[in-house]
């Protein structure tokens, strides 16, 4: 993200996504679980490459007072895309006889749309064109952590965002099981809770700009981390597993 021109780099990464999604479409159609697992790894790699670029490009195109709002929009868009994709994928794959074809077609179309969108990203000059890249992920990760520890503010911010993503990914993965086994809800209740989860993230991301007064305000980070932890613990103590023989309830009954 620092060594190369960012808009050009983003286009290459989005082009890579098209190739991966073409492979995913074939894996869905031919029901190749092994290929899907391999492509899932490649999508994780692609996301890892794209993440630093999409965040580091913001300061080069936004004013200082726009940075918090810009980060909020990116964060909201990222989580909404994950949740909508989770819901849409479940709906499409369940369509009898056509599910794999529909899922494969949609992921390829979305990848192409993403690449076309990247063509409109304005240029952003590299911050460190002479940077030497260390291809050893272990030593480079350790070096990066050591660098962040030199600045207490940056290090605590890294811990905060890591905690947020850890909890967010955990909730997203476990929410269907939690809904069925603990709340006794069916797939419609899962959809309802995922939608509520997405709305909460979206509203919180936008409120961050308002609460921070349009400036980078690190004082909000501890409150957010504490809120995530406290309400997570509350969710644990409020959970009462339903009886195994109980029938699942719908969204209307749940409300």
Residues covered by each model-derived region:
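Alpha-helical transmembrane-bundle signature of multi-pass membrane transport and export proteins
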Residues: 1-255
